[in-house]
Amino acid sequence: MISKTKNQYLKQLAEKIFIEDKNFAREFKVHSAAKSVHHGYIGGLLEHSLSVAKICESYASLYPQLNRDLIVMCALWHDMGKVEELSSFPENDYTDEGQLVGHIVMGAIKLDRLIREIPGFPPKLANEVKHCMLAHHGELEFGSPKKPALLEAIALSQADNLDAKMETFAEIMEKQKEDQEWSGFQRLLDTRIRKTSI
C-alpha cells in the first residue's frame, strides 16, 4: 500500500512511521487495537489498520472524488496512538497517558512531530492529515475531538466503524453455542444479534 502511494510527502511520512522507526513498527505489529471491544488480541492493531486501509482503498476506487493517497495512508496510521494508549501484552490495559489523553490525540501529536521532520511538507496537507486522525471516530460523543470536515475524514470514520462492528459481531458469534440462534443483548451494538440463516 505504501509503495503505491504517489504523494511523496505522505509516502515519506508512512516510511518514517512504519519502516524507519523499527521499535514502533515492531510494537504496532503485535499490539491490540483495544482492551476488549474489537481486535483486542495480539496483532489486532495491525489487522484492524490493514482492514480499514483496504476498505478505504475500495472507497477510493468507487468514489474518484476521494484522494486515494490521503485516505489510505491515514487509514494505516489512524490508530497509531494505541501503541502508547494501551500497555503491551500480557497486561493490555490503559496506560496513565492513555486514560488522560487518549489514542486520537496521542496519535495526532506524534504525527505532527513526524510531519515537522519532513522538509517542505505542505502545511495544508499536514492539516488534512491531522484532521483525518482527529476526526476518525466520526462524532464528538464517540471521542473525536473534531467532526469530519473532509470527504476523506468522513469515509475513514465510516471504514473504521464498519471494521470494528464486523469484528465485534464475529467475536460475539464465535462465543455463541452451536444451537443458539440469537445472542443476548449486546451493549456495544445496542441490540441482540443473530447469524444469517444461509
Where are these regions (language model features)?
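N-terminal intrinsically disordered, cationic/polar leader segments
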Residues: S157, W182-R187, T196-I198
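Alpha-helix initiation and N-capping motif
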Residues: L10-K11, D21, A126-N127, E152, ...
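Generic detection of intrinsically disordered/low-complexity segments and helix-coil linkers/edges
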Residues: K22, Q176-D179
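Divalent metal-dependent catalytic cores for phosphoryl transfer on phosphate-bearing substrates
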Residues: S58-Q176
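Acidic/His-rich, divalent-metal-binding segments that scaffold phosphate/diphosphate chemistry
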Residues: M1-G98, E139
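Residues that form generic nucleotide/phosphate-binding pockets
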Residues: M1-T5, K16-I17, C132, Q158, ...
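Short, mixed-charge aromatic SLiMs
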Residues: H136-G138, E178-R187
